[in-house]
Each structure stands twice: as C-alpha cells, then as structure tokens.
A protein has these predicted regions:
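Conserved short alpha-helical segments that host acidic/polar catalytic motifs at enzyme active sites
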Residues: 1-299
Length: 299
C-alpha cells in the first residue's frame, strides 16, 4: 500500500502550503519507507524524493523553500520490492523525456512488459512509467489498460504538456475535492485525509445538508482516466482492463508460509496473504481474511 496525492490550480491562487504539508504528513500512514513530489516549472520537470517519511521530507530545504507550483503530484511509499535506499525505486518515478508518475497498486507482469530492455529501477511501477512515456502512436492510457496485469491508481505529469494532470484508476482509490472559491482541484488516496488536512466538514441548517462549504467531492469510477487541463476537464474516459487468470497464476504459491498477493474479498483491493498465518488482514480496509472467505469468493 502506498499513498498518492496532489492538486491542479486553474487560476492564480495556490493552495495553503500549511494544509498541503499537513495532508502530505497524514498520507504517510499509507507508507513510511520513502516519499517525494514532482512538478513542472519553466518547462523543466523537477523531482524531489528521499528514503524518508513525508513528515521528515517536509522539514527539508527542498520543501521549506518551495513556492508551490500550479500542479503537483506527491507520494508516500511502503516498499514491496526494491530497496528504498536506491532512490530510483522511490516515487515519483520519471523518464528522460520528462514524464513523472506516482503509483499506488501492484503490477504482476512488469517483467513481461520490459522483456530484455534495460531498467533503471527494481519496482513494478516502472512498467507503468514505461508505457506512458514511450513514443508511439495511439492512446497511451489505453495501452496501459491493455497490457498491465494488476491494480493502479496513477497520477502523472508531462513537461511536454505542462498544463495537464493525468489521473488513471483501476481497482485502487482516487478521491477528488474541488474548491470552488480557490478554483483548485485536489486528489488523494483517501477522502478522510483531505477532510482532516483542510478541515472540511458537513454543513447543515434546519435539517438541510448544505454540503462541505466550498468543497465539492467526487470519486473517480473504476477503469477510468481523468485528464485535467487549464480550463477544466479535458476528458473522462472509461477503458476495458486486461482480463487475467490471477487467481490460478498468482494467488497460490507452493510453500505454506509463502507470501502471496490476493484480491481482498471485502474491498477488492490487492493485499498480502500468508497461507500459514493464523490471522491475515487487508492492508487497505483492515478486514480479517480467512481461507474460508477466499473459498466463498473464488470457490
């Protein structure tokens, strides 16, 4: 489990830096092994990341001296493969041609996607960066859905399109808040983190629900991409994911104490499962998962 967050400013107003700092710090509950952020300024992609939790990164000069840009993507990492001591493994991942991504999820077939091509990192997320940054005709996001086996909540920026934010969702959460007074769109892996950091509360009067002040909540639908430009929503498109036989190929392993990746029968997110362990809990929803639960779903 990792965390992604960020924002897109449509006008000249920038977010309250203290609130963005609070949100970034709260996001470390989803990953404390590394953290980072990326943005585009003067047609240059700028990435700051380190093998520290976000509450420590926000104390660094890179963050303290930063004037918030128009668009930013951010990440907190819980490592599943690839040491955090190799900063290439930490997010945001970025390519030589100026694409940067943050990813929450699991890719099972990254070796298939890369083949014999040389890799810069040791993490499965690199396959998503590869598919989004290669120069080829056609819809790059469709290519992602066509080829990736796994789950992903992705935010991406590209220096060739500096006014755009790309959000892509398959099985992992992306929640959105639009602040109409400041004309800023925020996104995060968890709605509650945004609510707490920005002090967003439900307002009622005489029994009428008046919403959440100037904040308007949206939840991205599964298997969709959202492209935001300087004027608003450029596209919101549904895709068909690649069909796989994960249960037979991925969810069983030979050893009783081996760790396997399963789909939680309660929230349908990917989580770790130890066949020989007495108690397993989903890292996303916290529900206990038993062998009987899995048989009821997949049997």
């Amino acid at each position: 489990m990792c965390g992604i967050m960020g924002y897109h400013c449509f006008g000249n107003v920038r977010p309250d830096k203290e609130k963005i700092t609070d949100m970034f710090t709260l996001l470390e509950t989803r990953g404390r092994d590394a953290s980072g952020f990326a943005f585009i300024r003067d047609n240059n992609l700028i990435v700051h990341k380190a093998p520290v939790k976000s509450s420590e990164l926000t104390k660094s000069p890179d963050w303290k001296n930063l004037t918030l840009p128009k668009i930013m993507i951010m990440h907190t990492r819980m490592k599943t493969q690839g040491t955090e001591k190799n900063n290439h493994n930490n997010h945001p991942l970025f390519s030589k041609n100026g694409t940067a991504i943050v990813h929450n999820g699991i890719v099972y077939n990254d070796k298939e996607i890369f083949g014999k091509k040389q890799r810069d990192a040791e993490v499965d997320s690199e396959s998503i960066l590869h598919l989004l940054s290669i120069k080829a005709r056609g819809d790059k996001i469709k290519r992602l859905f066509d080829r990736i086996e796994g789950s992903f909540a992705v935010a991406a920026i590209d220096k060739s399109q500096p006014d755009k934010l790309f959000l892509i969702k398959k099985d992992n959460p992306i929640d959105l808040y639009y602040n109409s007074s400041d004309d800023i769109l925020y996104f995060c892996s968890e709605r509650e983190i945004m609510q707490e950091a920005m002090n967003i509360k439900q307002i009622t009067k005489k029994g009428f629900n008046l919403g959440e002040n100037d904040f308007h909540f949206y939840e991205m639908e599964n298997n969709h991409s959202l492209i935001i430009n300087k004027d608003g929503v450029e596209s919101y498109q549904k895709y068909s994911p690649r069909l796989t036989d994960w249960w037979e190929k991925r969810y069983y392993s030979p050893g009783k104490n081996d760790e396997t990746l399963i789909e939680c029968p309660w929230c349908f997110c990917q989580t770790r499962y130890f066949e020989g362990k007495l108690t397993n809990r989903c890292t996303e929803c916290g529900m206990e998962i038993s062998e009987e639960d899995l048989l009821n779903v997949w049997g």
